Amino acid sequence: MAKVLKSSQSCHFPSPSSSSSTSCGGGNDGSNRDPHSPFNISRREEEEEEEERSEKERERFELSSALEILVSAIRRSVIGGCVGEEDLCSMEIGVPTDVRHVAHVTFDRFHGFLGLPVEFEPEVPRRAPSASATVFGVSTESMQLSYDTRGNIVPTILLMMQSHLYSRGGLRVEGIFRINGENGQEEYIREELNKGIIPDNIDVHCLASLIKAWFRELPSGVLDSLSPEQVMESESEDECVELVRLLPSTEASLLDWAINLMADVVEMEQLNKMNARNIAMVFAPNMTQMLDPLTALMYAVQVMNFLKTLIVKTLKDRKESRDKLVPASNPSPRDHNGDQSSSRQLLHLMKANKEETLDNFEAEMKDKEESADEEEEECAESVELVDIKKSSLVNNSSGGFGQKHIGWEEQRTMSKASSIVGRVNYRVELFEAWR
């Protein structure tokens, strides 16, 4: 009873001390209304955790379903590839395991790819005449190579420049390879050469300068593989030839091409005023690369002598080869191969005609001499008759008329005989002169 009264009193008579108890007594109703109560906060956290768990379970389910679909697809493809049915296996892409697709195409550094389908052509960019962006200052390994007339493998751009230099009469121009071209035109021609084009209105001096520049701008000089001591010690032609054989194949081909180019220039020395020493002097600094300018200048003198010796030897070899082609003077109508040359045949034909003409002339002169002898005999007989008549007339006649008549007959007979003898002597002199 006491407890009930107390509870009723606390409910009907609020007091400051009982206010808290009232709030506590009515906690079940107030807890649902106050959002900041500890009970509501914990419940809200539980609900969020449940939602997170449900989302994770949903993601796991979706992932597992996707994996199951992927695994089933792979399983079907593998099973389909392993099935013994030929039709099914032929349709599968992954069945061939050892397949090679070989395509043969032609690559032209001047015009790009050749032989590709038409639909691929617009996508293929045009390339420079070498694998690099320029033909100057790059290695010969990255350039298009061709064979020259001597079988040397050299860059195609060098052969193009050489051909244009020869066709434009550059070898006959005075000071070729010594006189430099215009800088502005040289830069323009460089750009055109990088495109694989040589302009038509090019100056031969500019073209010759670009040939020297090509050698000068190589990553490594043509003679850099040889030591300066080896070059200095090579003085004779045989020593220089042996030294050239020590060069790598690429450098040896480039040097042989350059030496023959310089020899062609020297053969036109009367027109271009460039002898072996002059052309070797302008090419020597372009064949080596040294950091020290003074050392490079001193070494260039030795290289000049080396190049000069090779040029002179090349000219000698050319002269010997030309002499072998021309048949030597031989009295025999046949040469060392047993064949008759056209000039030899013509010479013998002219000689035979001359001998035949002389024989005919001798026969004719012999006939005329015989006729002249007969005439002389007749003249002699007539002279004897005249003498006889003269003596008879002198002895028998006593007047001057008879003497006058005898003198006229004698003069006429003697003049006729002398004219015949003179004509015979003239024929003999003519025959002797013809001999």
Swiss-Prot record:
GO terms for biological process: plant-type cell wall organization; response to anoxia; signal transduction. It comes from the Eukaryota. Residues 7-23 have a biased composition (Low complexity). Disruption phenotype: No visible phenotype under normal growth conditions, but mutant plants have increased sensitivity to stresses induced by oxygen deprivation. The record marks R178 as: Arginine finger. InterPro entries: CRIB_dom (IPR000095), CRIB_dom_sf (IPR036936), Rho_GTPase_activation_prot (IPR008936), RhoGAP_dom (IPR000198), RopGAP1-5 (IPR044785). Residues 138-319 form the Rho-GAP domain. Gene3D superfamilies: CRIB domain (3.90.810.10), Rho GTPase activation protein (1.10.555.10). PROSITE patterns: CRIB, RHOGAP. It holds the Pfam family PBD. Residues 93-106 form the CRIB domain. GO terms for molecular function: GTPase activator activity. Induction: By oxygen deprivation. Acts as a GTPase activator for the Rac-type GTPase by converting it to an inactive GDP-bound state. Acts as a negative feedback regulator in tolerance to oxygen deprivation which requires ARAC4/ROP2. This is Rho GTPase-activating protein 4. It comes from Arabidopsis thaliana (Mouse-ear cress).
